A protein has these predicted regions:
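A short coil/beta-turn micro-motif at the C-terminal edge
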Residues: 77, 122-124, 134
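ATP phosphate-binding glycine-rich loop and adjacent ATP-lid/helix-beta elements
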Residues: 94-129
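Short, highly conserved beta-strand within the GHKL-type HATPase_c fold
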Residues: 79-83, 127-129
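Short beta-strand/loop element within the Bergerat-fold HATPase_c
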Residues: 68-78
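Helix-loop-beta hinge of the Bergerat
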Residues: 9-45, 110
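Acidic ATP/Mg2+-coordinating residue in the GHKL
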Residues: 86
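Conserved ATP-binding N-box helix of the HATPase_c
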Residues: 46-68
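Glycine-rich G1-box
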Residues: 89
Length: 135
């Protein structure tokens, strides 16, 4: 059964609302490009996207000391771009030992033939970029 972007949006929004209750000091933005409102994902794609967004937001809350987290869904050429960006402490991506969370994020996105990129530097925050082929 397919998962609409609206279904995914509700799940992510509910997760963010719960996170807000736990950490009041963080400002969340959740943006979906109106041109992709009607797309849907297979249940495997939808669940993997949800879990990766959840992990990225969780990492921002737990490790980044961020005051702002933005989740942004957009259409770019022939893929859907999902960006999770925080203004936290960042990390040196070259020297960090990847934990299970990041490993699992990459594995989940590979499963749906997507790409995952993490860009971070100390004191500049972290951006997790997910690209999922648009059917």
């Amino acid at each position: 059964e397919d998962l609409t972007l609206e279904d995914l949006k509700i799940r992510i929004y509910n997760f963010i609302e719960k996170a807000k209750l736990a950490v009041n000091a963080i400002h969340f933005d959740f943006i979906i490009d109106p041109s992709i409102q009607n797309i849907s994902f297979s249940s495997v794609e939808g669940m993997n996207i949800y879990r990766v967004v959840q992990e990225a937001v969780h990492n921002s809350i737990k490790y980044a000391d961020a005051t702002s987290i933005k989740v942004d869904f957009r259409k770019e050429q022939n893929y859907i771009s999902i960006k999770i960006k925080d203004n936290g402490i960042g990390f040196d991506a070259k020297n960090v030992i990847l934990g299970h969370g990041i490993f699992n994020m990459k594995k989940r996105i590979n499963e749906v033939h997507g790409k995952l990129q993490i860009v971070s530097e100390p004191q500049t925050g972290t951006t997790v970029l997910i690209q999922i082929p648009n059917k």
